[in-house]
A protein has these predicted regions:
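Metal-dependent de-N-acetylase/amidase catalytic core
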Residues: 2, 20-31, 109-284
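Bacterial N-terminal signal peptides
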Residues: 8-17
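Short, solvent-exposed loop/turn elements at domain surfaces
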Residues: 40, 271-273, 319-322
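Gly-Asp-aromatic-enriched flexible segments
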Residues: 78, 283-403
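Bacterial N-terminal signal peptides that target proteins for export
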Residues: 1-8
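Active-site rim/loop-helix segments in enzyme catalytic domains that contact anionic ligands
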Residues: 20-123, 153-157
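Solvent-exposed loop/turn segments at secondary-structure junctions
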Residues: 35-37, 63-66, 102-106, 134-136, ...
Length: 403
């Protein structure tokens, strides 16, 4: 089992508009059976990834040409592709690949395994989300899970990503505790909109299957209600998910979560260490948000003299709007204009800290620091700049209290 650090806090410093450019972009893939399933089962975490500036690709192994009660397969496949492209825009995906295999009869062939392995290799994926490869349930979904699992054996060790399972409507009913639960409250509406882009499914096919087609077609309000109730079963906080939320967010934070997505480490592929978890799932954990234009961020962490903390930060901010100059948490060097930065000699835009709300003694943090608290007090974070009003962007900061 993966164990979170005893005290782990992720702090996000951002401004509007958000640049969302991390120190090193992650390359994420979500592989599933039908256009719309990436949105349903991983639309929330995808929105969080792209919000943070990471690159995400969706890959559907069928064209969805059987998911309708009236449309002909070719016409439906074309329509569902267009719907996928609308969802691509909503989620800010870089790519949405739809393979031209028929819906309902997906087979685990050498050809498709090679295509999947090639896509993973070409994308240079760091992490791949896909279905749990079980038996029973929907043929295509389960087959997709097996295809990805077996395709992983075609990858060289240096190309091997981390694989993470997402549970579909069948495997979600199994008794298990997910390894990860992601709070998607802030992107719930984005996920809902991405699912809603697939009108052939959420306005026509699914209502038809439930015997409410006429009612749904008659009212936009009922359509919105149906979309919500069609999506919410895969985003609710069940008791088993609550345990995973508490593990990574803490009990108090977990109580406040309304919408969630659950995931599980695959037993194949590269395995994550504790450090990898927050690197590959950077949105997970307690999150504080504050404008990069603000003076100081109150972390809420009370330090005692002599305590040791480690701080890791990544991201990028625009510290000079007029000249379009960017920097990472180490700051921009050199900088000669102005002399009233809190930490002289450190780069403009660098991540800095202080202990105590009114403290005048500040220190450089940068990308990585181990700090011995020289006095007791609350930890604050800030941006090393004599004028923060022209800043944009974000830093993501993880703080661990060692002792």
């Amino acid at each position: 089992m993966l164990n979170p650090r005893i005290i782990t806090i992720i702090i996000v410093i951002l401004a509007t508009p958000v640049l969302g450019i991390s120190q090193e972009k992650l390359k994420v893939m979500v592989i599933f059976a039908h256009p719309d399933e990436g949105e349903i089962y991983a639309g929330g975490i995808t929105a969080l990834y792209t919000q943070l500036g990471h690159d995400v690709k969706f890959m559907s192994l069928t064209n969805g040409d059987a998911g309708h009660y009236a449309m002909k397969p070719k016409e439906l496949a074309e329509r569902r592709y267009k719907e996928a492209m609308r969802a691509k825009e909503i989620l800010s995906l870089l790519e949405y690949e739809v393979l031209d295999y028929h819906d309902g009869i997906l087979e685990n062939t050498e050809e498709i395994r090679k295509k999947v392995a090639s896509s993973i290799r070409d994308w240079e994926a760091d992490v791949v989300f896909t279905f749990y490869p079980a038996r029973g349930g929907h043929n295509d979904n389960m087959t997709a899970g097996w295809i990805v699992r077996e395709a992983s054996s075609l990858l060289d060790e240096e190309q091997m990503p981390v694989f993470i399972y997402m549970r579909d409507f069948h495997t979600a009913s199994f008794s298990y505790i997910p390894d990860f639960a992601i709070n998607i409250d802030e992107v719930w509406e984005t996920k809902l909109a991405a699912c809603g882009a697939h009108e052939s499914q959420v306005i026509e096919y699914n209502p038809k299957m439930e015997g409410v087609l006429d009612e749904v077609l008659a009212s936009k309000e009922i359509q919105a209600d149906f979309l919500f109730h069609n999506t919410i079963p895969f985003s609710i906080v069940r008791p088993d998910i609550r345990l995973a939320l508490e593990k990574w967010y803490g009990k108090e934070e977990a109580k406040e979560v309304t919408y969630v997505e659950e995931f599980e480490m695959a037993e194949y592929g590269r395995q994550m260490t504790d450090e990898d978890v927050f690197e590959l799932l950077p949105m997970m954990g307690k999150v504080h948000k504050v404008s990069a234009r603000a003076d100081w961020l109150d972390t809420g962490i009370e330090l005692s003299e002599g305590q040791i903390i480690t701080i890791e930060a990544n991201g990028q901010i625009l510290w000079n709007l007029k000249e379009r100059k960017y920097c990472n948490p180490d700051g921009a060097v050199p900088y000669t204009r102005g002399g009233n930065k809190p930490v002289l000699g450190a780069g403009t835009g660098a991540l800095i800290g202080r202990i105590g709300e009114d403290a005048t003694q500040c220190f450089l943090i940068g990308k990585n620091s181990k700090i011995h608290a020289f006095k007791s007090g609350r930890l604050y974070l800030g941006i090393n700049d004599d004028n923060t009003q022209d800043n944009e962007g974000l830093y993501r900061v993880r703080i661990q209290v060692i002792k």
